[in-house]
Amino acid sequence: LITLSTAIDPASEIVRDLFDALPKLAVKDPSLWGEDAKSDAQTRLGWISSPQDAAQLMPKVAALVAWAAERQLDHVVLCGMGGSSLAPEVICKNYGKEITIVDSTDPGQVRHAISDRLSRSVVVVGSKSGSTIETDSAKRAFESAFISAGLKPSDHLIIITDPDSPLEKSALADGYQVLTADPTVGGRYSALTAFGLLPSALAGVDIENLIVDAISATNALTAADSPAVTLAAILGAHEKFSPYFSVNAPHGIGDWIEQLVAESTGKFDHGLLPIVVESSESPGFKEPGTLSISINSPANANLEIQGPLGAQFVLWEWATALAARVIGVNPFDQPNVAESKTKTGLMLENTDQLSRKPDLDFGSVEIFGNSEGATLVEVLGDFFDRIPANGYLALMVF
């Protein structure tokens, strides 16, 4: 099910270590990433058996699909952030099924989703913790819209969350349909859990086919020529020289890989940052000295990976966890994500910072920060000159 175009040296120290680690990962050994990561790993390795565990989930998913069909709800809306929404979006793109994703508090995005076939919408609200502010805001917006339209929210909403979360408790009290997820699977590893499977099934995806491919791939990953070890060794060794590698992948799977790899490995001045491109002809895809990876698309890349979507999910999850061992980081925590949330909370508590005036104002463009230049062109030129050798420019679009 999975083929890689590149071989590795089986005698290398990294490869030998990864083959020693492989059977331990298969049995969910939490010691693979060191003593400091052990407590996190003990409660975050459920994804190893997610393909097999999905069989127990199928009857519940089928019942909810039937529930939506009985009510003639054929427009699927998914409210969720990050790992709660990326995988279903990729799955639906891959299978050519429509799904509306609400993964932002942008009023325009929420308003558009609410105005589109509201009476025929089944709204899936996914939050692992049950306390995600952005997702709760979207849920409240849809509840208000349903009530204003004379519709019962309980006839349209389905909740996916961890057992005993605040969201599960409130949803049951409100009479909503609830599907609980495996609490031992983190959001970015949840593609083959309730978070990935239910929204996709509601949209019409044959998730049984997806699961069969994932199970077959899992068996291949534990073999003597494991493609997970090959990919992990390449990624782990590459990180010693550069944090960046480019990915050319269809149907949005590159975006899913980006979050999985970057959030799992990026911390404490280490990690990998996938640069997702739209085609093998995109600028920078095959720059000298860079690692280029192409998925299900011939591109003459450094590494070409062939395999169905279910197999890709499993391969990248295993390879990412193993690469984190090579890099020397805990793949299951996200200190910078927590830091960002804390800083955002402080900004919201101190709204005077949000009303700060720009240092330079060019009408439609405002500049915050010190800069030498009297015109926009001069300011941008000064900014670009500050980018160090082998540095990068990040455009953060909100």
PLM-predicted stretches and their roles:
Residues 1-76:
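Low-complexity, highly charged intrinsically disordered N-terminal segments
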Residues 2, 45-46, 79, 84, ...:
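Flexible, active-site-adjacent loop/turn segments at secondary-structure boundaries
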Residues 9-22, 107-108, 185-190, 252, ...:
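A short acidic, often aromatic-flanked loop/helix-cap motif at beta-alpha or helix-coil junctions
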Residues 14-17, 60-63, 166, 209, ...:
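Exposed alpha-helical structural elements
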Residues 16-40, 82-93, 251, 349-356:
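Short, compositionally biased "basic patch" segments
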Residues 46, 205-211, 218-336, 346-398:
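Acidic catalytic cores of enzymes that act on phosphate-bearing nucleotides/polynucleotides
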Residues 56, 63, 86, 90, ...:
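Generic recognition of stable, solvent-exposed alpha-helical segments in well-folded globular domains
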Residues 63-222, 291-305, 346:
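Glycine-rich phosphate-binding loops that contact phosphosugars or nucleotide phosphates
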